Amino acid sequence: MIEGIPPGGRGALFIGGTWRPPSGGRYSPVVDPSTGLALGEAPVATVEDARAAADSAAENEERWARVPGHERARILRGAADRLAADRETMARLIASEVGKPITDARVEVDRAVGVYRLAAEEIRQLGGESFPADAYERPAGNENRFLFTVRDPIGVVVAIGPFNFPLNLLSHKVAPALAAGNPVVVKPTSAAPFTALRLAEHLTAAGIPPGVLNVVVGPGDPVGDALVEHPATRLVSFTGSTSVGKRIAERAGRHAKRVILEMGGLDPLVVLEDAPLDAVVGATVRGTFGYSGQVCTASKRLLVHESIADAFGRALAERARSLRVGPALDEQTEVGPVIDGASVERLERLVEDARGRSASVLAGGSRVSIRGGSFYAPTVLDHVPEDALVVREEPFGPIAPILRFSAVDDAVRIANATPYGLQAAVYTKDLSRGLALAKRIHAGGVHLNDPTNLRWDALPFGGIRESGLGREGLRYAMQEMTEVKLISINYAGS
C-alpha cells in the first residue's frame, strides 16, 4: 500500500470538518497508470453530498472572512511547512495516482509549497484604492468627502482540479481563495483523489477551521453541476478540457456567477531560421515530452523554418529515441505513462491520421508495453499538414508534430489558426523579430527563447479565446476572488 492512501484503500469525503463515506455507498477504482493495477477506491459523492459540502462552506463564510489576514497568512504558511515536511510521501502519491515521474512529482510538491507561501505574502497586498473626491463635480459636496475602495471576499469558491497536476493546480485555486477570506469546496479529479484528500489533512492540521474547506469526489455530472448551481457558491475555478469548461460557464452564467477557466490549448513553438538549434531541441524535449505531454502548456505544434527543418527533425528524433520510458516510481524514468488506456488509443488514432495525410514518423509512433501500464513512445512527426488531426485536436500526449514554413507571415497564420490561445514560444537570435512576432501571436503568454510550458506562480497565467477566462497567479486569482466595494465618507460637520 502506498503511504497516503487510507487504511483499507478507501477514500472518504471531507465535509464540515469530518470524514464521511459517500451517502450513496459507491466507490470507484483508482488505477496506477504505470501498472494498470488498482491503488485503492475513490468515494463517489452524490448530489446530496455536494449540496452538504456547499452548505457547510456557506455556513462558515462569515466566520472565515472575519479571521484577520495575518492569522490566515500564518495558517497558510503552516500548511506550506507541513507539505514541505511531507514532500516524499506526497510525491510518491502523485506519481502513483497519475503516472508522473517521481523526479517531476517532487518538483510539483515544491511548487505547491511555494504557492501557499506566496498566497500568505499576497494577503498584505490585497488592498483597495483612494480617490480625490474633490476632482469630481457630481454629486455636489465632494470637497467634504473621502472615497476609497476595499476588496471583500466573494463567497464560496468551487475549485475543480485536473489529473495532470493534482496538487499544484489545485493549490492555485485553494490557496488564493483561502487567502482572500473565502471558504472552498474542492472537487478533485476522480483519477487522483488521494492527493487532494491528503492536502486537506495538511490544511486542517495547519488550522483551517471546520467547514471552511470541504472535499467531494465524483463525476462532473451530476456532482460538479450541483456545486456550480448551488445557490451559495459564487465563483467556480476550473482547470480541464474546453468542452467541460464551456459547460461550467454556461451553467454558472445562468446564475450570474463568476468563473476562472483554464482550458485546452494547441500551443505553438515557432523556430526561425537563425534559432540556436541545440537550445531549441532541448526546449522542445522539455516542452513537448515533459510529463508525457500531458500539460496544457506543452509545445503541441512545432512551426519550423524550412531551411533548418531537416536538421531540427533529425536532432529532435535522436533525443526522443534516447528518452527513458518507464514506471513513474523509477528514479531513472524520463517519460512515464499517459493517464489511461483510452489516452493511448487516442494517440494511436492521431498518429495514424497524420500518416494517412503523408506525415512521416521520425521517432516513436507506437505504444510501449511495460507491465500493463499505459505507455506511448515519444513521437516526432515531420511534414505534418495543417489539416491533420494532431494539430487540430489537443493530443495531450508525447507527440511532437513539425509543420514547415517559409515566410514569417505563414508562421503567424498557422500559429493563430486555432480556436485556442494559451501559450506560445518563439526562438530567434533577433529579439526585435521575436518581439514583433510576440505581438502578432494570439496567446495569453508568449516566451522568447524559452519553451511554452513556463509558468511563474506569482504572475498572471491564463489563455484567450477557448483556452480560458480570467487569470491565475496568486495576486491575480485573489483579485478575481474578491468584490470591489466603494466606501464614501462625508465628513462635513462631523
List the predicted regions and their residue ranges:
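Rossmann-like NAD(P) dinucleotide-binding subdomain of oxidoreductase/dehydrogenase enzymes
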Residues: 128-279, 405
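Structural signal for hydrophobic packing residues in well-ordered secondary-structure cores
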Residues: 61, 65, 80-87, 91, ...
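Short, structured beta/alpha segment
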Residues: 1-96
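Short, well-ordered beta-strand elements within core beta-sheets of diverse protein domains
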Residues: 38-45, 60-66, 158-159, 269-272, ...
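Conserved C-terminal structural/oligomerization subdomain of aldehyde/semialdehyde dehydrogenase
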Residues: 35-41, 233, 270, 324, ...
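ALDH superfamily catalytic-core signature
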Residues: 235, 243-385, 448, 493
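N-terminal Rossmann NAD(P)-binding subdomain characteristic of aldehyde/semialdehyde dehydrogenases
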Residues: 65, 70, 74-170, 213
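Residue-level signal for inorganic ion chemistry
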Residues: 36, 72, 94, 116, ...
